[in-house]
Amino acid sequence: MKKRSRRMQELVGKVEEQLYEPLEAIQLLKQISTAKFIETVEVHCRLGIDPKYNDQQLRATVTLPNGTGQTLRVAVITRGEKINEASTAGADLVGAEELIDEIQNGRLDFDCLIATPDMMPQVAKLGRVLGPRGLMPSPKGGTVTFDLAQAINDFKAGKLEFRNDRTGIVHVLFGKANFSEEALLGNLKAVQEAVDRNRPSGVKGKYWKSIYITSTMSPSIEVDYNLLRDLKLTENT
């Protein structure tokens, strides 16, 4: 078992084993995010799903109202006039078969891949490369579309795709540790609502098991899901 650093031991000591009210959890997380760089903030949702079954798998998108704090590199696979549309809309990489070949040969310098439906038969052969990295375009994720300008703008502005892992946990980044408390709370609420809105049809019993927030170099803090679910935010949050 890896030994904790003195810094981590001190931070763990500041987090009590309890359910925290959402804003209180965010305030504490900001206090313990003391690395020498701006840490990324994530939420981990442990759900009562069995990913072995298709009707219990979760894959959806969330638009963070206060952005991600990251500069997202968007790649687009399309052809013809759509290439100009994608470039004009701000895509970082655009191409057809040649971009597919580059990706197959190891090019992965992008965070999001969008494809037009007519290119999906060719994109399908990239499944082994893109699938494990969560980059495979999908209609559910909003990354298979002819409306390239809208999709590019949405993802650049803070739209994220998320899915459960093999153990039924969903991991979603929801900002940076230097965001205001209100901005992080608004983003966290958006994630909770998106997970609830896209509840898989095959789920039986309790859907939410636990929800934790953490930053890159901090211990995790458990949030009271019921309080988060019932939270009403003002329009400017």
From Swiss-Prot:
InterPro entries assigned to the protein according to its UniProt record, in alphabetical order: Ribosom_uL1_bac-type, Ribosomal_uL1, Ribosomal_uL1-like, Ribosomal_uL1/biogenesis, Ribosomal_uL1_3-a/b-sand, Ribosomal_uL1_CS
Q: Which GO BP terms sit in this record?
A: translation
Q: Does the keyword Manganese apply?
A: no
Keyword Endoplasmic reticulum assigned? no
Any one Gene Ontology MF annotation carried by this entry is:
structural constituent of ribosome
* SUPFAM superfamilies given in the database record: Ribosomal protein L1
Q: Quote the cellular component terms of the Gene Ontology held in the record.
A: cyanelle; large ribosomal subunit
Q: Name one Pfam family in it.
A: Ribosomal_L1
UniProt keywords (A-Z) are: Cyanelle, Plastid, Ribonucleoprotein, Ribosomal protein, RNA-binding, rRNA-binding
Q: Where in the cell is it found?
A: Plastid, Cyanelle
**What's the main place this protein lives?**
plastid
What assembly does the database describe for this protein?
Answer: Part of the 50S ribosomal subunit.
Give the record's family classification.
Belongs to the universal ribosomal protein uL1 family.
Query: Which NCBIfam families does the entry mention?
Result: rplA_bact (TIGR01169)
Please give the name of this protein: Large ribosomal subunit protein uL1c
In its UniProt entry, the species of origin is given as Cyanophora paradoxa
Q: State the taxonomy lineage.
A: Eukaryota, Glaucocystophyceae, Cyanophoraceae, Cyanophora
Q: Which gene encodes it?
A: rpl1
